[in-house]
UniProtKB/Swiss-Prot annotation:
Catalytic activity reported: (2R)-2,3-dihydroxy-3-methylbutanoate = 3-methyl-2-oxobutanoate + H2O; (2R,3R)-2,3-dihydroxy-3-methylpentanoate = (S)-3-methyl-2-oxopentanoate + H2O
Superkingdom, natural source: Bacteria
A Pfam family assignment: ILV_EDD_C
Complex and partners: Homodimer.
Pathway terms, separated by semicolons: Amino-acid biosynthesis; L-isoleucine biosynthesis; L-isoleucine from 2-oxobutanoate: step 3/4; Amino-acid biosynthesis; L-valine biosynthesis; L-valine from pyruvate: step 3/4
Protein name (Swiss-Prot/TrEMBL): Dihydroxy-acid dehydratase
Cofactor note as given: Binds 1 [2Fe-2S] cluster per subunit. This cluster acts as a Lewis acid cofactor.
EC number: 4.2.1.9
Keyword Cytoplasm found: no
Residues at which [2Fe-2S] cluster binds: C122, C195
Name of the encoding gene: ilvD
Segment forming the signal sequence: none
SUPFAM superfamilies in alphabetical order: IlvD/EDD N-terminal domain-like, LeuD/IlvD-like
Amino acid sequence: MPKYRSATTTHGRNMAGARALWRATGMTDADFGKPIIAVVNSFTQFVPGHVHLRDLGKLVAEQIEAAGGVAKEFNTIAVDDGIAMGHGGMLYSLPSRELIADSVEYMVNAHCADAMVCISNCDKITPGMLMASLRLNIPVIFVSGGPMEAGKTKLSDQIIKLDLVDAMIQGADPKVSDSQSDQVERSACPTCGSCSGMFTANSMNCLTEALGLSQPGNGSLLATHADRKQLFLNAGKRIVELTKRYYEQNDESALPRNIASKAAFENAMTLDIAMGGSTNTVLHLLAAAQEAEIDFTMSDIDKLSRKVPQLCKVAPSTQKYHMEDVHRAGGVIGILGELDRAGLLNRDVKNVLGLTLPQTLEQYDVMLTQDDAVKNMFRAGPAGIRTTQAFSQDCRWDSLDDDRANGCIRSLEHAYSKDGGLAVLYGNFAENGCIVKTAGVDDSILKFTGPAKVYESQDDAVEAILGGKVVAGDVVVIRYEGPKGGPGMQEMLYPTSFLKSMGLGKACALITDGRFSGGTSGLSIGHVSPEAASGGSIGLIEDGDLIAIDIPNRGIQLQVSDAELAARREAQEARGDKAWTPKNRERQVSFALCAYASLATSADKGAVRDKSKLGG
């Protein structure tokens, strides 16, 4: 029978000092012996996805204590990728994932907490907490802040839906008037919550559902809706049950590594491909799998991408649907239901509610359930009122979207495409693979060949795009922006958005060893591995080289002979200490980022730290 971890600090005469300090936090004699549960919050006023979380930790804590536990809350950092985008701040985004994971480990292990409720939401916070949860392997439930409502405005006498990416594209489009750009900017992000499309934050919150670590509805129920409060209340009650099951009944099925098994990871990736999730999810799932000591690799993702169709299409891949529409159609469980009926899921998995996949679908799939309360929950909709307050409205759709032929979520027979929304490509400068969000690629450019325009920083590429130096047919190559080379693996949302602003969205390709925002669409290929700074062949591409992209056949090829590439590699190596570094790039890199770069692996490994470099 496992011993409560917290007993280390609450029992025994020699722990009198620790108990004295616990008493100073409000604990009493009656609390010693109860499980101590960490409420891991991420409130900050910097991030709209987290601005409403200040009081939500208290909601969870009250339920924990009512159920017989002791709740202790702490906060992690949270970086807003949208605000950090397009300048030096983006260097810090991906490294913050490791800081978040480490800080959770530090706090939980330093104070011997028994379990956790993780209150996350945005891009690197959910992955960082997920990595920590699987590293620590103590009972955990995730409950995120929820998606933002889609923006809406009237343009050309038509009401259209908007999001952050629209504001970025129109702001850089010389054909758009100042007044229209201002109107879109003011309408794009109307409420608290994670940005309203299937961007990285919402993708990851959906994947925690598929992994079994959060409750049904977690990925899609709006941040502003009153129904979302119940997820927080339930999480506080349920975590005490899970904790007691493990420590008092020796039930290891309550542990995250047993819930988020390899079968669950395969289900999560299957969901990701079917819903056209952010390419960043590949990085984060690979990283989380390593923390769980699960053998889940790019090869597994490649195999899944070849058989899973696209059953859901959401912004940025279409302007018709946002997360509020996914929820109306049944949310994550709705997509999983269609995948299950197509025979594409592992059914022998459980979630934090203790339900198997078939049991979860029977109760929560809107196409199966007889529970009116569940149907009512999935009718929770937007109010269209600007607010930063959680649970501030109770609007509902008149009906569910259960149209699996033409609705937001489709059945296998009516799939958006037989190929899924993500694909892994391999070739002579991406030997370990690269990732493309096929959901956002127009059919006309699934095969594309063009001359390379090579840039050794995102900034130079942006200047060239806006300066008219990139023309139709070009393949923009941005290198030395990987985990080590950036350092920090910047997102390339501005270059891809500006290509659209310049009318080149369907006329050019962009390839990088960096990564893309979940808001990116178009022929944008990232995560090229090995990265240039690690000696990857992307560092050998020269202006004018022809690059052939073949998404249907999963290929990407630099049309240069092996002999020529060998000669270029020899010349690169001859640069000595300057080999595999960008030429003529001035970038101030802090000690903190240098420390990250010194251990960073390429994207095919999840951009995690290379433990072999630490010795031991």
